[in-house]
Amino acid sequence: MRWLPAFALILSAPAAAAQLLFAGGQWVALDRGGTCEAASRSLRIAQKGKVQARAGFAFDANGARHGQFFAEMSRVPRAGSTVILTVGTQPFMLATTGHWAWSRDPQQEVAIIAAVRAASGMRVDSRDASGRRIIDRYLLDGAPTAIDAAAARCASAKLAKSRRNT
């Protein structure tokens, strides 16, 4: 039953058939065709009609993304507000648009993944338009395996594609 919260993430995924690669702890790894994801939902379950906060790492079979961190926040941050991902005690400033925040560059992505491997939890913090604090918390149990599964699947897809083209 520990995988049930992670499985709920699959059910909320778009109907574009995602193949489950791994489900463990609070995380899943999904193959969505050209994109693979390691993802989780926040600890707080959204009320009906509200946005369910979720976060994860995206990998592309074409190599464009190698573990880009992304987060869909529970509320829209105030315009110009800083969004901080804190993994364990290590902070990372994220780029944002609307409900979404993501890593700024490949070096930051490597640092975030390394921090995830050593921590038990992370949170995404900001302020909304009325100045209220937004805190979306995540457990990292299962995250390293989900990240590895997503990365490996997209790497193998990229390798298979390059072999077909030669």
Locate the predicted segments by residue:
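Bacterial N-terminal signal peptides
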Residues: 4-12
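A generic "folded-domain core" signal
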Residues: 17-166
